[in-house]
Amino acid sequence: MIATRDDVCRQAGLQYGWLPHAFQAPRTLRGWLSDRGSLTQRLRSRYRDFRVLPVLRGVAAPFPDESGALGLARDASAYVRDVLLLGDGKARVFAHSVLPRAALRGGWNGIARLGTRPLGEALFRTPRVRRLAMTMRRVDARHPLYCAARRHAEVAERALWARRSVFCLDGHPLLVSEVFLPALLTP
């Protein structure tokens, strides 16, 4: 059976150790992990100075678990955007977005031009965008998402909690992973 784009949108994210709940997460992080609202809005309301710092953008190979979740071939490339979400000058969240290249020609075509604007604003302002699967897990040095977060932010912890959401627009999935950095829980 050949999967359609809508099938990929429905199934993405529910694999590779990603779970639909955060029961094992520290109590202080559970609300952040499970909140289905805009992370951008939540960070803006918590910090006086909220900014987006782009650290990587362009065509790249998705992480292995992302290719599977998006229904891409293992050797396929995608558009990748990595940013740090800063609150009062400190990196609070590392965000990693992956979009199949074919989707850049459709409704997602503005993603490549976001620059320092938050992706969350575009996602939650567009009525046709649907948030589907939202999963979470603890990532450590064995997971490339942890390594990417550590490369761009000062992280001493051996593991971090992350959540991953699939947003769908016109049948095209966009995978957004957010790694919650230790500074999120500090003033």
Curated annotation (Swiss-Prot):
EC number(s) stated in the UniProt entry for this protein: 4.1.3.40
One example GO MF annotation: chorismate lyase activity
Known catalytic reactions: chorismate = 4-hydroxybenzoate + pyruvate
Ranges in coiled-coil conformation: none
Amino acids binding substrate: 81, 119, 178
Pathway as given in its UniProt record: Cofactor biosynthesis; ubiquinone biosynthesis
Keywords: Cytoplasm, Lyase, Pyruvate, Ubiquinone biosynthesis
Gene3D superfamilies: Chorismate lyase-like
GO-annotated biological processes: pyruvate biosynthetic process; ubiquinone biosynthetic process
Chief localisation class: cytoplasm
Record function comment: Removes the pyruvyl group from chorismate, with concomitant aromatization of the ring, to provide 4-hydroxybenzoate (4HB) for the ubiquinone pathway.
Family: Belongs to the UbiC family.
Protein name from the UniProt record: Probable chorismate pyruvate-lyase
Protein's organism: Thiobacillus denitrificans (strain ATCC 25259 / T1)
